[in-house]
A protein has these predicted regions:
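Extracellular low-complexity, O-glycosylation-prone stalks/linkers
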Residues: 1-59, 66-89
């Protein structure tokens, strides 16, 4: 499956950030999002959002920390290629 497109990280504060992306309507049943502290390769936090969503707010982040985040679309239990970004709070 092709990955979702145009992953943008916006509204970054000391402890939160908004993710937004694009994908064709009904292309995916859900999206899997994973993120972790980039430098320390901390344990990834993994979550799932409905396939109708095109944004998600990450909360509870650490100030002054670089994060790696990626998103995959899921259709019929099969994940797409990942789309990733790096951002700093």
């Amino acid at each position: 499956l092709p990955a979702p497109k145009n992953l943008v990280v916006s509204r970054v504060t000391e402890d939160s950030a908004r993710l937004s992306w694009t994908a064709p309507n009904a292309a995916f049943d859900s999206f899997g999002i994973a993120y972790y502290e980039y430098v320390s390769y901390g344990e990834a936090i993994v979550l799932t959002v409905p396939g109708s969503e095109r944004s998600y707010d990450l909360t509870g982040l650490k100030p002054g920390t670089e994060y790696f985040v990626y998103i995959q679309g899921v259709k019929g239990g099969i994940p797409s290629e990942p789309l990733s970004a790096i951002f700093t709070t």
